């Protein structure tokens, strides 16, 4: 304490979940939906995502909810590799240096999952997560649901100084496929959710996930309706 006396306090031990990728299957009415949460972008994440998507494909899920809430980023290369799982020969992100020169990153031809999807984002969605979210939104691959993202889109280089300190110098910025600068602006979702988030993301009490289920089910219902209309016209 401030007066120098020693005091004993009890600390509650809690397990820390270090799994960067979590997945489960949800049922919404007549639809089977996959839930896929990424907590950070580490080196192992792209491989884990591919494995998770293949497992969900085997379970015949019709659509996927991708949860990027409170994912503050990590390895940008990992986020780009995950975007590659969902996008077929599409622009993922552009980098623009201080001279205005742009460099583009395009996804490969093969995708691991090509069904309908929605993506949950919030103010804690940053950096590599925003690159992924922006790529999905701008390519009309996934609607974004939730709140405006953080807005971290700078590429910085650390320059050492003579006193053993350093200074971060901005060398480039990230742009979404539509040319939107992420830095300081973030990404605005297609559908805003203005109510409180659950303490445990992905739990049965998570109203954001429930809203994503409803949104995705409406897409799947329209898809079924269109297929039925095609079948009727074929018979005619």
Please place each PLM-identified region on the residue numbering:
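A short, sequence-level motif marking secondary-structure junctions
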Residues: 12-17, 174, 189-190
